[in-house]
């Protein structure tokens, strides 16, 4: 199984560092970016299988555009105040899940599950 690359857009630097540490144990490489434009460029450049997107820096429309532009990438959204309505909207827009940014287990589990499903489908 080929390791997946992850692109991370997270506005809180402490949370970002925690996520980078957790993700680095499970993925080929983790690249942290500072903007949505940089996220798009990095997904293409690194052929990322996973994009983790802070919903405080992006809109549902952004999630929808990313999922159309990169249909094989697993998009995991994070938001500190996510509720059921936000989760439903994000999943309908193409995200795999919405997790609290502090729940690194949920984020890693979602990314691993969806990345392995994508790889199985491609095989």
Q: Which ranges hold each PLM region?
A:
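Negatively charged, flexible loop motifs adjacent to catalytic sites
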Residues: 38, 58-60, 81-85
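Short amphipathic alpha-helix used as the core "switch/output" element in two-component signaling
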Residues: 60-72
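Two-component signal transduction core modules
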Residues: 51, 75, 98-99
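Acidic, metal-coordinating helix/loop segments flanking the phosphotransfer/catalytic sites
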Residues: 34-50, 58
């Amino acid at each position: 199984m080929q390791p997946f690359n992850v692109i991370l857009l997270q506005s809180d630097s402490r949370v970002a560092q925690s996520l980078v540490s957790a993700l680095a144990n499970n993925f080929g490489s983790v690249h942290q970016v500072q903007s949505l434009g940089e996220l798009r460029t990095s997904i293409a450049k690194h052929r990322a299988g996973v994009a983790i997107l802070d919903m405080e820096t992006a809109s549902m429309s952004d999630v929808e555009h990313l999922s159309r532009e990169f249909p094989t990438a697993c998009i995991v959204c994070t938001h500190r105040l996510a509720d059921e309505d936000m989760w439903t909207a994000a999943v309908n827009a193409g995200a795999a899940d919405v997790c609290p940014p502090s729940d690194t287990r949920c984020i890693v589990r979602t990314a691993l599950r969806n990345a392995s499903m994508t790889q199985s489908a491609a095989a």
